[in-house]
Amino acid sequence: MTFPPEGTSMRYSFRTLRSKLFFAAVLVSPITSLAQSDSKLRSNYVVSVQDLKLAGKGHAAFDKGSRLLEKGDTAGSVAYLERAISESPEHYKAYYDLGVAYFRLGHLAEAEQAFQKAIDLTGGGFAPPQFALGAIFCQKQEFLLAETILQRGVEIESGSAIGKYYLASAQLGLNRLVEAERSAEQALVRNANLAEAYLLLARIHQRQRNAPAVARDLEVYLKMDTHKEFARRMADKIQQEMAQDTAAAVIAAIRP
């Protein structure tokens, strides 16, 4: 992508890029934590005839690949997950974990295909790949499609903080700020330790020009986020953007 894209103004292209960078930043952390914590989500998925058929098929390769993924050896997990799929083509959990691995490696097209396959194999009855696919569509700024997929996932896993978080991201992208704020707050009700939700709320409140709320969101976020350097950079970035937006509004108001 050229910068700025031909045929657009510098200001427009900067805002578009800024939005893409924001969604890339906030989506990376939860999607990896989703892979590490989805054992609880998986346990909530009703064991079906399909699960029983999968017992034993590709099990060893899947377990090895999943363990490597959880330990952070993303590249090493791929071969085992692909082997599990070759041994058991209906192994939807292997497709899901493979999608997570591809996402971490930056191979979004392959991740999208793997998540979609997991959805297809379960007839849309397994929420995690729907959350992950919605996250990818948010990152691609296909927000309407993301919202549709995420709504389906939330209907399956209504108690999922991750699902509500991504839904808020899609609604922010659609500029439906009241709905986005509600979804982000619901994510925090489900998981009060989801620091990224406070960062997302700061973005929502920034769009609403609610400076006191932004300040509160960032204060909580900085206290919670363990990656302090990244958290401080993101907080500083939002504060700078608010100052720029305020200055631009003042200049526009005083111009004849």
Question: What are the language-model segments listed below?
Answer:
Residues 51, 58, 92-93, 126-128, ...:
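Helix-start (N-cap) detector for alpha-helical repeat units in TPR-like alpha-solenoids
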Residues 44-60:
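TPR-adjacent "capping" and linker segments in tetratricopeptide-repeat scaffold/adaptor proteins
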Residues 38-49, 207, 212-256:
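Terminal, low-structured helical/coil segments at or just beyond the last alpha-helical repeat
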Residues 87, 121-122, 156, 190, ...:
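Structural marker of alpha-solenoid helical repeat scaffolds
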Residues 70-82, 104-117, 140-152, 174-186, ...:
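Structural signature of tandem alpha-helical TPR/SEL1-like repeats
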Residues 97, 131-132, 166, 200, ...:
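Canonical tetratricopeptide repeat
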